[in-house]
């Protein structure tokens, strides 16, 4: 197993961002004419922070070019501090972004590339900087001023959780499908939280369709023992061709890359509650709901990742 070649930094992280401090649970009631701002921001070791700001009515909702015409918040002041210095992020528009990033955006929101890149299409906006990168163990404060609203959040980049091994096992009824397995030895007296993504045959990384996070209580509370965990295949949720009878399996011929990310508790709780609501058929930011967020003054997540990468090659004949 080894780390694959990296995609361009922005393109790599936006796969997690679009499909996508103090912890709090909030009840959201739609406010007509004054949408709350949703933060989708992340930082990881050796890469700069990336922040996408959208408006609450569209988060996790069905999308087309009309409903997304004003999804991105422009003209915001976005700052990140690592405790030593504070930097202001630069706003980048889709017409100034590389083709690799535009392709990632179109895949994540389920719209054709032409809808994102054409002059009359969607105007995507992302905030980033080359002046600051994440570090393991770092603590990062986000501050946003936009639409006469002030938002703030704090996240950390936990130590990396290293897997003992990664492999596949055959489907019980056919040798053309396989289940991805990981083995993990839990350090005693440590709380661990993970979000994972998979890439198949060099395609973009996607989280599992239903649940992308694993928590201390469910999987890792083993007091130093070793546990084997089956993982599900990642999907673009806007893919209309998913066969749910076998959705969790990989083809035996697939080359799989697992992106296994350590996250902190606040980050875990956001995805856990947001995915639960989404899987129940709701839109957590357009209907009254309980959802955990570390964003003060807004919605969404400012989260640190510490990823490890594992390659699983097809079974030899």
What are these regions (language model features)?
Residues 18-21:
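C-terminal motif of bacterial Sec signal peptides marking the signal peptidase cleavage site
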